């Protein structure tokens, strides 16, 4: 009966791999109706989930007893997607009513899937405000599988500071093998195949089972192959001749042609490598070590001699060179498991030009490419069978005849750790042995699977090196060390730097530094190279809002909403567009739409709160900022928004507390320090306010907002000359800001220089003839500065000399000064 089920299951997986979800669902329903097994249940639920019907998968699994780990994990995943967090936790760890399972229990139960299970459980804990337990789950997940990125990302976002050097490393062989199930346990099997039969071993998918049974190519004791879920970068020549086996140091038997060949490295992506040996890379198969003294890249790759099988005498051998069939920039461990290329293998093969009855190929089942970050295989076959196994996302055997391999000149390598192709001899050639082994009288044979594993581990180490650098940059960004983040990410290899994700992080860093011109430049580059990217575009839209670029913002919002109407980023961009046009009611509707699309999107709540502030609906604004904090307690923009509202309500102590909370999250923000200084001065802490403003100016020496407020505090403390010096410097930064000239006039009035005071008041009127800044002056706290006795000029009376010169931090967004202190960070 099992044999009859396998073709149906194979057809289902083939439909899934080709995104034919309706066909997959239909066939899976037929299979489950025929066979009410746990495997068929899981397959049907998988079809529902992949087709975007998580609620169907949830109800199906919920209505049946889920005993296998794979069904439990999928059910918990559905619960999380449907916001049933408590139920998801109950399924994975036992919940609050039952005895909770420890991490070790979860590892024992879920096996290779434990890293994903712990990551999902950590997400549940963080969403339910149990950050400590969530952090433990994320860290355990990373220790089990350092190829995962999202747990590290989540740790950074909740305020933890994981060490990338300790996180992204292959600590042991066991650690590496846990990411690649059974990578080094698959044995070499030798098959005597007739001439022109395929001499390859391919990992089978359900749809390939029958053909593989016919060819009898599956190793009887091999449950998995290295290509568990993906065929990423592969050797399309299908064979590596016996003389391709790596040799020990200095043991190569080289032909004259090989010795004269220039030493080159060949990329696993095709074409010569342009990267230096120290460049973090994981798509490079080096054909020589970087330098005679540096064998670290592939250390221990070929430290033991190899026994080389060769062709019979007189049989010219067609040698193949290990090369990549893929082109472009795809590399090892980077693709999904749904590609359909033929999976490569390492095969020791000889082909005679004359009739040859049989060969004895040395077949290596584990290939050198496998994505450790892909989902691990199911722990057992969907249908038990002695003759074959059925696996997900493997590659289809399409080769009916062996490929014709043209004669090639061999690539050689003379240094330690490389691939060497000796010339063909009439008999078995044994390479020179390591001196230590010779002295002991021992001969050790390097098996092909160990060689493949070492190659694989070297590629994985390259990926680890890249992840460490990216992790350092992302950690610095989440800690708001923006300059450090920019420096780290800018030194990534160019092909990684010029990607949307990296550039978005750099653009966000410039945005946090209030360097909006630089941020716009970076984000525009993102739009050029990845016009389909939506993530991060909400920051780009706010950048354009700050720069008052209404046309570019309109184009961006139109493109995003046309591309993805279910994206909160698109509606945030549309809201910013109308906010810039001062159509606040429409902007509010768009921000509310963003929240409707994703209720857990904190930035949409923050933008909505700022719009309510502009329409003087402070109670609604307070609710929005509190919701943003509920969704993301580390969203410092919302803490700032609360402080701003309390300042407007003259609740200065509450304002200072909330500004300080925002500063604790983002200690590098000069704008937050500036606002704290303003509140401290309002609380009659003038000296402390000056110290705070000085710190802000140290962080950002050219921040006009900080310098203006420091000048205002100096003026209030009757330090007129210091205030005048500060204002003269500020005038060079913002030469068209009327408030600066107005405060200079106030200073000259106090110094008794009436003619200079009149001149500056006149300039202020010229820069602001319609009195647009009167809205600011009307909102100024009269306690901030002492009132003047009498206005000395008509201009000063019009400008409101009895008012303080401090900005209200909220209004008149058409001035340069306000742009620097905008509500929207």
Curated annotation (Swiss-Prot):
<feature type="repeat" description="TPR 6">
    <location>
        <begin position="499"/>
        <end position="528"/>
    </location>
</feature>
<feature type="repeat" description="TPR 3">
    <location>
        <begin position="67"/>
        <end position="99"/>
    </location>
</feature>
<feature type="modified residue" description="Phosphoserine">
    <location>
        <position position="427"/>
    </location>
</feature>
<feature type="repeat" description="TPR 4">
    <location>
        <begin position="115"/>
        <end position="145"/>
    </location>
</feature>
<dbReference type="GO" id="GO:0019903">
    <property type="term" value="F:protein phosphatase binding"/>
</dbReference>
<feature type="modified residue" description="Phosphoserine">
    <location>
        <position position="387"/>
    </location>
</feature>
<feature type="region of interest" description="Disordered">
    <location>
        <begin position="782"/>
        <end position="825"/>
    </location>
</feature>
<dbReference type="GO" id="GO:0141198">
    <property type="term" value="P:protein branched polyubiquitination"/>
</dbReference>
<feature type="modified residue" description="Phosphothreonine">
    <location>
        <position position="209"/>
    </location>
</feature>
<dbReference type="InterPro" id="IPR019734">
    <property type="entry name" value="TPR_rpt"/>
</dbReference>
<feature type="repeat" description="TPR 1">
    <location>
        <begin position="6"/>
        <end position="35"/>
    </location>
</feature>
<feature type="modified residue" description="Phosphothreonine">
    <location>
        <position position="313"/>
    </location>
</feature>
<dbReference type="GO" id="GO:0005654">
    <property type="term" value="C:nucleoplasm"/>
</dbReference>
<feature type="modified residue" description="Phosphoserine">
    <location>
        <position position="439"/>
    </location>
</feature>
<dbReference type="GO" id="GO:0005737">
    <property type="term" value="C:cytoplasm"/>
</dbReference>
<feature type="modified residue" description="Phosphoserine">
    <location>
        <position position="822"/>
    </location>
</feature>
<feature type="repeat" description="TPR 13">
    <location>
        <begin position="737"/>
        <end position="768"/>
    </location>
</feature>
<keyword id="KW-0539">Nucleus</keyword>
<feature type="repeat" description="TPR 11">
    <location>
        <begin position="670"/>
        <end position="702"/>
    </location>
</feature>
<dbReference type="GO" id="GO:0072686">
    <property type="term" value="C:mitotic spindle"/>
</dbReference>
<comment type="similarity">
    <text>Belongs to the APC3/CDC27 family.</text>
</comment>
<keyword id="KW-0833">Ubl conjugation pathway</keyword>
<dbReference type="GO" id="GO:0005634">
    <property type="term" value="C:nucleus"/>
</dbReference>
<keyword id="KW-0802">TPR repeat</keyword>
<keyword id="KW-0963">Cytoplasm</keyword>
<protein>
    <recommendedName>
        <fullName>Cell division cycle protein 27 homolog</fullName>
    </recommendedName>
</protein>
<dbReference type="Pfam" id="PF00515">
    <property type="entry name" value="TPR_1"/>
</dbReference>
<feature type="repeat" description="TPR 10">
    <location>
        <begin position="635"/>
        <end position="667"/>
    </location>
</feature>
<comment type="pathway">
    <text>Protein modification; protein ubiquitination.</text>
</comment>
<feature type="modified residue" description="Phosphothreonine">
    <location>
        <position position="447"/>
    </location>
</feature>
<feature type="compositionally biased region" description="Low complexity">
    <location>
        <begin position="349"/>
        <end position="362"/>
    </location>
</feature>
<feature type="repeat" description="TPR 9">
    <location>
        <begin position="601"/>
        <end position="631"/>
    </location>
</feature>
<feature type="modified residue" description="Phosphothreonine">
    <location>
        <position position="205"/>
    </location>
</feature>
<feature type="compositionally biased region" description="Polar residues">
    <location>
        <begin position="363"/>
        <end position="372"/>
    </location>
</feature>
<dbReference type="GO" id="GO:0031145">
    <property type="term" value="P:anaphase-promoting complex-dependent catabolic process"/>
</dbReference>
<feature type="repeat" description="TPR 2">
    <location>
        <begin position="38"/>
        <end position="65"/>
    </location>
</feature>
<feature type="modified residue" description="Phosphoserine">
    <location>
        <position position="291"/>
    </location>
</feature>
<feature type="repeat" description="TPR 12">
    <location>
        <begin position="704"/>
        <end position="734"/>
    </location>
</feature>
<feature type="repeat" description="TPR 8">
    <location>
        <begin position="567"/>
        <end position="598"/>
    </location>
</feature>
<feature type="modified residue" description="Phosphoserine">
    <location>
        <position position="436"/>
    </location>
</feature>
<dbReference type="GO" id="GO:0070936">
    <property type="term" value="P:protein K48-linked ubiquitination"/>
</dbReference>
<feature type="modified residue" description="Phosphothreonine">
    <location>
        <position position="367"/>
    </location>
</feature>
């Amino acid at each position: 009966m099992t044999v009859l089920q396998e073709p149906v299951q194979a057809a289902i997986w083939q439909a899934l791999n080709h995104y034919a979800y309706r066909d997959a669902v239909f066939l899976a329903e037929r299979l489950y109706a025929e066979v009410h097994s746990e495997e068929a249940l899981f397959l049907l639920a998988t079809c529902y989930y992949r087709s975007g019907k998580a609620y169907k998968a949830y109800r199906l699994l919920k209505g049946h007893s889920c005993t296998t780990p794979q069904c439990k994990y999928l059910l918990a995943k559905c619960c999380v997607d449907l916001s049933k967090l408590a139920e998801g936790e109950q399924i994975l760890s036992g919940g609050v009513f039952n005895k909770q399972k420890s991490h070790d229990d979860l590892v024992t139960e879920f096996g290779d899937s434990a890293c994903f299970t712990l990551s999902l459980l950590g997400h549940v804990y963080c969403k339910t405000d149990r950050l400590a337990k969530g952090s433990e789950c994320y860290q355990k997940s990373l220790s089990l599988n350092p190829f995962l990125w999202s747990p590290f990302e989540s740790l950074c976002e909740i305020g933890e500071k994981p060490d990338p050097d300790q996180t992204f490393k292959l600590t042991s062989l066991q650690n590496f093998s846990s990411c690649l199930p059974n990578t080094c346990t698959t044995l070499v099997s030798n098959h005597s195949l007739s001439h022109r039969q395929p001499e390859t071993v391919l990992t089978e998918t359900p749809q390939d089972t029958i053909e593989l049974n016919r060819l009898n190519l599956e190793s009887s004791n091999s449950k998995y192959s290295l290509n568990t879920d993906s065929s990423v970068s592969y050797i399309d020549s299908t064979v590596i001749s016996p003389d391709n086996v790596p040799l020990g140091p200095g043991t190569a038997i080289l032909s004259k042609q090989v010795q004269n060949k220039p030493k080159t490295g060949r990329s696993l992506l095709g074409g010569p490598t342009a990267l230096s040996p120290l460049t973090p890379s994981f798509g490079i198969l080096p054909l020589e070590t970087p330098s005679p003294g540096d064998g670290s890249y592939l250390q221990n790759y070929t430290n033991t001699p190899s026994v080389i099988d060769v062709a019979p005498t007189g049989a010219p051998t067609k040698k193949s060179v290990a090369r990549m069939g893929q082109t472009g920039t795809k590399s090892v461990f980077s693709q999904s498991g749904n590609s359909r290329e033929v999976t490569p293998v390492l095969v020791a093969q000889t082909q005679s030009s004359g009739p040859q009855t049989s060969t004895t190929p040395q077949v290596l089942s584990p290939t050198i490419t496998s994505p450790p970050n892909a989902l691990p295989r199911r722990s057992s076959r969907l249908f038990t069978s002695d003759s074959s196994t059925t696996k997900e996302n493997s590659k289809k055997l399409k080769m009916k005849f062996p490929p014709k391999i043209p004669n090639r000149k061999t690539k050689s390598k003379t240094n330690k750790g490389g691939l060497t192709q000796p010339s063909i001899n009439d008999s078995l050639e044994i390479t020179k042995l390591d001196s230590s082994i010779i002295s002991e009288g021992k001969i050790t044979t390097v098996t092909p699977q160990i060689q493949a594993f070492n190659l694989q581990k070297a590629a994985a180490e390259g990926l680890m090196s890249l992840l460490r650098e990216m992790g350092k940059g992302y950690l610095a960004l989440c800690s708001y060390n923006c300059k450090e983040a920019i420096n780290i990410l800018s030194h990534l290899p160019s092909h990684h730097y010029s990607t949307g994700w990296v550039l978005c992080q750099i653009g966000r860093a410039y945005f946090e530094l209030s360097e909006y011109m630089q941020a716009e430049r970076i984000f525009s580059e993102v739009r050029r190279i990845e016009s389909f990217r939506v993530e991060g575009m909400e920051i780009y839209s706010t950048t354009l809002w700050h720069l008052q670029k209404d046309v570019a913002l309109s184009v961006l919002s139109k493109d995003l909403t046309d591309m993805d109407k279910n994206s909160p980023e698109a509606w945030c961009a549309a809201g910013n567009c109308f906010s810039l046009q001062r159509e606040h009611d429409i902007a509010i509707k768009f921000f509310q739409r963003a929240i409707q699309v994703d209720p857990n999107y904190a930035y949409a709540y923050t933008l909505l709160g700022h719009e309510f502030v502009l329409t003087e609906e402070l109670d609604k604004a307070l609710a929005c900022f509190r919701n943003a904090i509920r969704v993301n307690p580390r969203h410092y923009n919302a803490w700032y928004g609360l402080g701003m509202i309390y300042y407007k309500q003259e609740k200065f102590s509450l304002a200072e507390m909330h500004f300080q909370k925002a500063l604790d999250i983002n200690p590098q923000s000069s704008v937050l320090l500036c606002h704290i200084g303003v509140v401290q001065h309002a609380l009659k802490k003038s000296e402390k306010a000056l110290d705070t403003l000085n710190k802000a100016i140290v962080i950002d020496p050219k921040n006009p907002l900080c310098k203006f407020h420091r000048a205002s505090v100096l003026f209030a403390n009757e330090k007129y000359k210091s205030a005048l010096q500060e204002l003269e410097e500020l005038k060079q930064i913002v030469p068209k800001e009327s408030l600066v000239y107005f405060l200079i006039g106030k200073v000259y009035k106090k110094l008794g220089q009436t003619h200079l005071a009149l001149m500056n008041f006149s300039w202020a009127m010229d820069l602001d003839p319609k009195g647009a800044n009167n809205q600011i002056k009307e909102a100024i706290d009269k306690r901030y500065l002492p009132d003047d006795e009498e206005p000395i000029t008509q201009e000063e009376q019009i400008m409101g000399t009895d008012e303080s010169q401090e900005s209200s931090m909220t209004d008149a967004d058409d001035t340069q000064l306000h742009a620097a202190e905008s509500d929207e960070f």
